[in-house]
Amino acid sequence: MSLCASDRRLVRLSAAIALGRWEELRVLRRSAPVGEPNRRWREVLLQSHLFAGFPRTVEAASVLTEAGGLGVCDPDELEPSAPSPAGGSVLFERIYSEQASAVRAALERSHPLLARWIAEHAYARVLARAGLAPDRRELCAVAALAAQEQDRQLAAHARGAVRLGATRAEVQEVLAEIAELLTPAALERAREVVAHFTREP
């Protein structure tokens, strides 16, 4: 299975936000087909604060709005985003699998509040939202993390994408899609990480 054209635009969107490539965002928005941006675009934008921080996410929202807008939100998008602890916990377990307990423990050792915020905000409130399939969310995370050369987290989310249903070929295609946005060294390193951590058991 290969990435569809819509998925290609999403991973490119995610990488461009992470890198602060505002002209790339303008091009993406202005060349979007009829029906896009849609909720999937908006979900990628919203989750980007987890990977790129609020400053770039806010700037990306402004750039996309000025370039043509983000479409009309569905009513359920605007419901109060109450966290779903159960949903977030299940998602965390699916992404990290047998390493989930060790990852939680490492976060706790770093700072207990960091572990709590990641569980309650990143997973329960943001990544467990409807509007974008979990495996597509992970592919967009792969794009953002590869763009920023965050190897350890790239490895985790590349594996997570496969565990959630993406194919290994799709994870590799993410890198091909964003290749021109990365430096040659960053691209080569990302390819090595993805090849190693998504190989067949």
Predicted regions and their residues:
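Alpha-solenoid helical repeat scaffolds
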Residues: 20, 149-150
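Preference for long, well-ordered alpha-helical segments
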Residues: 144, 150-153, 158, 168-189
